[in-house]
Amino acid sequence: MSVKIENIQCELLSKNWFKLHKYTFDLKTDEGTSVQQIREVYDRGNGATILLYNRQQGTVVLIEQFRMPTYVNGNASGMLLEACAGLLDNDSPEACIRREAMEETGYQVDKVQKLFEAYMSPGGVTELVYFFAAEYHPDQKITDEVGVEDEVIEVVELPFHDALAMVADGRIKDGKTIMLLQYAQIHFFPSSLTPQRC
């Protein structure tokens, strides 16, 4: 199906940290129907995320940090276990994720592998996230001082099978982290896959 967007009107609703717009537009389908729609769109820029993994040790590095939206939506502590991530600041996704890995985990990773791109909440948010992975080694740990400004971050290194168990039992609820761990299960730790019985 193809659609055509016409008569777009945009109204700025908020410009605090990011921009919230209200769009009014006509949506025409290839069958000839036309419907006026109104949508609020939150523009927070694009981001990047990375899974640090050590195949030999069978471990991954995640971070735990306070996330107010999760607190508002029922996470009693507001703390979220997740993969390192950050917003692009007029730099490339690769440069962004190297910087974020250093700032949030203390690991200096040079060789990063781009895995894929995904819109994380396309019903209302513009953000496109670039997903990466990098193999880490203990000698790449440059500092234990992590986080910038007012971030509350703890670095968590754990066995890969424990991370998968935390997805299954609900201790890991972050979408990007679940996607990265499942990718790693298929591509980096295939022995963790359980054979299906017929």
Swiss-Prot record:
Q: Which organism is it from?
A: Yersinia pestis
- State what this protein does: Nucleoside diphosphate sugar hydrolase that hydrolyzes GDP-mannose as its preferred substrate, yielding GMP and mannose-1-phosphate.
Per its UniProt record, what InterPro entries does this chain match?
A: NDP_pyrophosphatase (IPR004385), NUDIX_hydrolase-like_dom_sf (IPR015797), NUDIX_hydrolase_dom (IPR000086)
SUPFAM superfamilies in the cross-refs: Nudix (SSF55811)
User: What cofactor does this one take?
Assistant: Mg(2+)
Q: What does the record note on quaternary structure?
A: Homodimer.
Q: Report the domain remarks.
A: In the dimer, the N-terminal domains are swapped between the two monomers, such that residues of both chains contribute to the active site.
- One Pfam family per UniProt: NUDIX
Location of motif Nudix box in this chain is: 86-106
Q: Please give the GO cellular component terms listed in this UniProt entry.
A: cytosol
Q: State the Gene Ontology BP annotations.
A: nucleoside phosphate metabolic process; ribose phosphate metabolic process
Q: What class of enzyme is it?
A: hydrolase
Q: Which reaction does it catalyse?
A: GDP-alpha-D-mannose + H2O = alpha-D-mannose 1-phosphate + GMP + 2 H(+)
Its EC number(s): 3.6.1.-
Where do the annotations place Mg(2+) 2 binding? 100, 104, 151
Keywords in alphabetical order, please: Hydrolase, Magnesium, Metal-binding
The residues that the entry says bind GDP-alpha-D-mannose are: 38-40, 67, 85-87, 104, 127, 150-151, 176
For this UniProt entry, the molecular function terms from Gene Ontology, in alphabetical order, are:
hydrolase activity, acting on acid anhydrides, in phosphorus-containing anhydrides; metal ion binding
Question: Which residues participate in Mg(2+) 1 binding?
Answer: 85, 104
Record domain Nudix hydrolase: where: 43-180
Protein name as annotated: GDP-mannose pyrophosphatase
Family in the record: Belongs to the Nudix hydrolase family. NudK subfamily.
